[in-house]
Structure formats: structure tokens, C-alpha cells
A protein has these predicted regions:
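Short C-terminal tail/terminal secondary-structure segment
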Residues: 98, 102, 153, 218, ...
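Substrate-binding pocket helix/loop in short-chain dehydrogenase/reductase
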Residues: 102-105, 109-117, 199, 211-212
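Active-site helix of classical SDR
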Residues: 128, 164, 172
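Alpha-helical segment proximal to the catalytic Tyr-Lys
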Residues: 133, 177-181, 239
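Residue(s) in the substrate-gating loop at a strand-loop-helix junction
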Residues: 148
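Active-site loop-to-helix junction immediately N-terminal to the catalytic Tyr of the SDR YXXXK motif
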Residues: 154-162, 174
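A conserved structural motif in NAD(P)-dependent oxidoreductases
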Residues: 215-226
Length: 255
């Protein structure tokens, strides 16, 4: 039987990279997937791909244009989810990302700091705040936040990004305690370097690739590696797992 059969999942930032790979795997495992994405073209393409992969298992996918920084946008996306699929079981707060203009606190702008906080941390907060009541109505479920290896290990020159991802890890633990009585499990994934198409382009002409490879003992990750962990955390296989920051980093945190 498909591991997510009968489940409805809401994935933010599902148009590319880890989000798209996760949407495809969720659909393959029988879930009805809502891809909440700000970019219409990538969101539609991801939904079409997920639908194609999920047919044999009963999976389906829907794209909903969503800006996780705006309450009205998230409310509308969740309303469309309930209208289309009737409930919400799984919330994957995946939207976020680093910026090339990040830097040390004495050099980075205040605007960049708030940009990182609003997209990564506030977006996770807002989608959880508005999504949890729907999960409660469904009888419980799973929330999967997206932290990073930088929440566990220093990354000089990325003080805005590390602040946001570290806060997400802390919030994940407190949410896990808060909502356990409601039968909601809350965990976060902390990836190392993941070779999405965007990251491949950034590293194409960079000498950093050799340095990164040396600290990732089993090789650099792919979006599919993170997606497999998300499937596990979304499924009943992890029924006793909550409050955990799950590193999928090829050993980067132990080097």
C-alpha cells in the first residue's frame, strides 16, 4: 500500500528543487498534494509532473499561487486546499532560501536581514499558524519544517540565513511539545548542500565545489535525498518521531 494513501499535503516552495522532488514523491506514495508556489510557471509544471507520477497510487496535485509572507495569500491557498481535497494532514514548510547579498552582521543591510527572516522564519510561522487548525480538524498529522545544516554548524558570511534557519530549528522543538496533545508531530529537516538546478548554476564556475565535497563525506546531496526523508516524516512510519532536527547532510556536521 502507498505510504501516504489518503493523505493531503500542502508544500510551500514546491515549484523546484527539494519542494518539487518532495511533491513528486508524495504523489507517488498516494498523497493529494497542493503545491503552494509564488512562481506560476514552475508551480504549474511541478503540479503536472506530480500528477503524472501519482496516478497509479491514487496521488494527485494542485498548484496554488502563494506568497508565504502574506496572510491573505496563505489563507486563500489553504481554503483552496480544503475546497479541493476536503482536509489537510501534512504541512511541509519548504519555502525559503539564501541570498548572494547576505553577509556578516556588521556588513549586511537591515533590509536583507528582514528579507531573510520574513521569507524563511515568518513564512514558516504563518503557514503553521494558519495550517494547524485544519490539521487538528483532520485528527492530527505531520508538520515538516525546513531548517539547514547551518542551524547546527557555523557558516561565516551568511548571518541572516543562519539566524532564520536556527530559529526554525528552535521553533520546531517548541511546536512539537505544544501540539503533541493534538496528535500533530513537528520535525525539521536540516540538509547539507543539495545540488538543485539553482545550486548547480551557482557552483558551476566556483572553486567552492571541491571544499564542499571534502566536508560532505558521502557526496553532495540531491533533492531526491531530502524528499525521501520528508516522505518518512510525513508517513506513519515516524509515528513516534517529533521535535527532531533530522540532518541529511552527508556527514557535514561531524567534520
Amino acid at each position: 500500500m502507498a505510504r501516504l494513501a489518503g493523505k493531503v499535503a500542502f508544500i510551500t516552495g514546491g515549484g523546484g528543487g527539494i519542494g518539487r522532488a518532495t511533491a513528486e514523491r508524495f504523489a507517488e506514495e498516494g498523497a493529494k498534494v497542493v503545491i503552494a508556489e509564488i512562481d506560476r510557471e514552475s508551480g504549474e509544471a511541478a503540479a503536472q509532473s506530480a500528477r503524472g507520477r501519482g496516478g497509479n497510487a491514487g496521488g494527485d496535485a494542485l498548484f496554488v499561487h502563494t506568497d508565504v509572507r502574506e496572510r491573505a495569500s496563505v489563507e486563500a491557498a489553504l481554503a483552496e486546499t480544503i475546497k479541493r481535497f476536503g482536509k489537510l494532514d501534512i504541512l511541509h514548510n519548504n519555502a525559503g532560501g539564501s541570498s548572494p547579498v547576505d553577509g556578516p552582521v556588521t556588513e549586511v543591510s537591515e533590509e536583507e536581514f528582514w528579507r531573510a527572516i520574513k521569507l524563511d522564519l515568518f513564512g514558516t510561522f504563518l503557514c503553521s499558524k494558519l495550517g494547524i487548525p485544519h490539521i487538528v480538524k483532520a485528527g492530527g498529522g505531520s508538520i515538516i519544517n525546513m531548517s539547514s545544516v547551518v542551524a547546527l554548524k557555523a557558516l561565516p558570511g551568511r548571518d541572516c540565513y543562519t539566524a532564520a534557519k536556527g530559529a526554525i530549528a528552535a521553533m520546531t522543538r517548541s511546536m512539537a511539545v505544544e501540539y503533541a496533545p493534538k496528535k500533530i508531530r513537528v520535525n525539521a529537516i536540516a540538509p547539507g548542500v543539495v545540488l538543485s538546478e539553482r545550486v548547480k548554476k551557482l557552483l558551476a564556475n566556483s572553486k567552492d565545489i571541491e571544499k564542499l565535497a571534502a566536508t560532505h563525506l558521502l557526496g553532495l546531496g540531491l533533492p531526491s535525498h531530502i524528499a525521501e526523508t520528508a516522505v518518512h516524516l510525513a508517513s506513519d512510519e515516524s509515528s513516534l518521531t517529533t521535535g527532531q532536527i533530522v540532518s541529511v547532510d552527508s556527514g557535514a556536521t561531524v567534520v
